[in-house]
Amino acid sequence: MCIRDRYDGLSVSEIAGIKKQEPAEVMFDLLLDENLGISYVGLGANPQTLHEFVKHEAGMIASDSILFGAHPSPRTFGTFTKIISEYARDDKFITLERGIMKMSSFPAQRLGLKSKGLILDDYDADIVVFDLPKVNVPATKSNPRQLSEGIEHVIVNGSFVINLFLMGWSLR
């Protein structure tokens, strides 16, 4: 059993308690023992900082989460639905239209993806159809592998995505 399996899902503080070490020492040991091959889920971001980032004109919404281990970040399964359900629909912190723009056309433009992010002739038809009142993010730190709710259809390159088949050229 590798070290990461033994500690998967535990916080650095919990591992420090088990190993009777300081948290910083635990992090260094884990990095060394796993040849830098660890993943860390940080959930301590200040909500006000996140709000300011999302509101900022240059702020784009994305996730760098990966499916690593049994306890990936809950945002792996709910970054975009969290923006739609909480930030736009419930808290009205950002308009739905602006939130979608910050998740689609703005990043595509900034990254130079010329046929992505907008619904136009000769563009890739990448579309998510959702039922706004039903959009929900059940993923939590303790139970992160929960699919978002309220997403009715996902269309990538003009094809309906079924059974997680990877349709996009960048995903193949």
Task: Give a label for each model feature.
Residues 37-40, 107:
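Short, flexible loop segments at the rims of nucleotide/cofactor-binding pockets, characterized by
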Residues 124, 150, 170-171:
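A generic structural signal for well-ordered coil/turn residues at beta-strand boundaries
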Residues 1-2, 158:
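Short, small-hydrophobic-rich alpha-helical interface motif
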Residues 4-32, 46-132:
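His/Asp/Glu-enriched, well-ordered alpha-helical/loop segment
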Residues 51-58, 63-64, 128-165:
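C-terminal cap of metal-dependent C-N hydrolases
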Residues 164-172:
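Intein/HINT protein-splicing elements and their conserved insertion hotspots or analogous self-processing inserts
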